[in-house]
Amino acid sequence: MATSAVPSDNLPTYKLVVVGDGGVGKSALTIQFFQKIFVPDYDPTIEDSYLKHTEIDNQWAILDVLDTAGQEEFSAMREQYMRTGDGFLIVYSVTDKASFEHVDRFHQLILRVKDRESFPMILVANKVDLMHLRKVTRDQGKEMATKYNIPYIETSAKDPPLNVDKTFHDLVRVIRQQVPEKNQKKKKKTKWRGDRATGTHKLQCVIL
């Protein structure tokens, strides 16, 4: 299906934040979405930022995605990026029961920082390609998502990827469904870093 030309001006920008424990595949999902490659090796991230023009439901937008640190030693940074996010992907690995149990911590922190009873989020069950290592069932994931009243999706960044584009696009759809009054609170000029770029370029990267 043909897509329309990318508009040059006045595109809405959505700040999407990917959170979760270290090693659950946050960077692999993000890199697969932006660069269409699978990175199999785990390299702890401090903070990576990406920009992309994309068309979702016949509407063009700029996705400004922050891939965050999962390591506990960087937990002090979390509130800062949570304040500026328009929506969040809470990622756990289906092979790591502890990462699933820690979802509640991220969910509660987001609501506390945002001072809201609800906020655009999606619960992401990653690494479903590793079925022989699976420790968290689909039903357990769905039950948790129902508890939080947020969507649930299962993903794999490994080629061929499963639901990677859909996950990011669905989060934008959730944000768009919010009532205008709530969205107005988030229209401040905030930045995660310095100069911006367009396209699918990674803007800043600090690797341990």
UniProtKB/Swiss-Prot annotation:
Its EC number is 3.6.5.2. The keyword Nucleotide-binding applies. One of its GO terms (molecular function) is G protein activity. It comes from the Eukaryota. It catalyses: GTP + H2O = GDP + phosphate + H(+). Expressed in skeletal muscle cells. It is a lipid-anchor. Mg(2+) binds at residues 27, 45, 67. It is an enzyme of class 3 (hydrolase). The keyword Zinc does not apply. It is found in: Cell membrane. GTP binds at residues 21-28, 38-40, 42, 44-45, 70, 126-127, 129, 156-158. Belongs to the small GTPase superfamily. Ras family. This is Ras-related protein M-Ras. It comes from Rattus norvegicus.
